């Protein structure tokens, strides 16, 4: 199966530039029969991803698009509504063209590692972390209610008590090599379930 993974720096593997073969997408490609194409773009928002789907990916007629986005939407605007609208648009437009979409539920963030934003004192790290949590829950419910396949990258990065597994991150947002390994394992299981 040819899988196009659309995303931002988390998909691209921004913190693994020295060895991009350790990105989650590359690990999945190496460990399965699937052809996995990394379409991550550092700094991209779901609006940019939506446009890239229309101009670059839909014409390729992939067997599956994995859409993992929203991190930059929240970091730039402090809310997730536009990301929700863009994901709905991608899924509906892809379905019209007969292209299956799997939605990735994004990672949590390490709130204490976020840099303070003096121009927005009412938007502290805990507020932003709450937006990520709310977005993840919205995606989970929306995908379930609409019968859209989803891969939950969020919960595996949390401990049982709900705290973030910081050892899997290189900074506030990006997974390190161990985090990429975990993402690959999660996606491999999700693809197995999808193929059943």
Residue map of PLM features:
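Serine-esterase "nucleophile elbow" of acetyl-processing enzymes
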Residues: 1-48, 52-61
């Amino acid at each position: 199966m040819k899988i196009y993974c659309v995303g931002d720096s988390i998909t691209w593997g921004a913190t693994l530039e020295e060895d991009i073969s350790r990105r989650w997408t590359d690990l999945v490609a190496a460990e399965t029969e699937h052809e996995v194409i990394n379409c991550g773009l550092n700094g991209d928002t779901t609006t940019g991803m939506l446009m890239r789907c229309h101009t670059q990916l839909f014409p390729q007629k992939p067997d599956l698009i994995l859409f993992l986005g929203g991190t930059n939407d929240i970091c730039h605007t402090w809310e997730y509504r536009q990301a929700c609208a863009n994901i709905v648009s991608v899924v509906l437009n892809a379905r019209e063209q007969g292209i299956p979409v799997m939605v990735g539920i994004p990672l949590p963030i390490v709130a204490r590692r976020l840099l303070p934003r003096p121009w927005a004192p009412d938007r502290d790290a805990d507020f932003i972390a709450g937006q990520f949590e709310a977005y993840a829950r919205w995606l989970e419910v929306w995908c379930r209610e609409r019968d859209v396949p989803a891969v939950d990258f969020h919960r595996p990065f949390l401990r049982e008590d709900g705290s973030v597994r910081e050892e899997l991150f290189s900074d506030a947002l990006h997974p390190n090599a161990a985090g990429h390994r975990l993402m690959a394992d999660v996606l491999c299981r999700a693809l197995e379930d999808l193929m059943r």
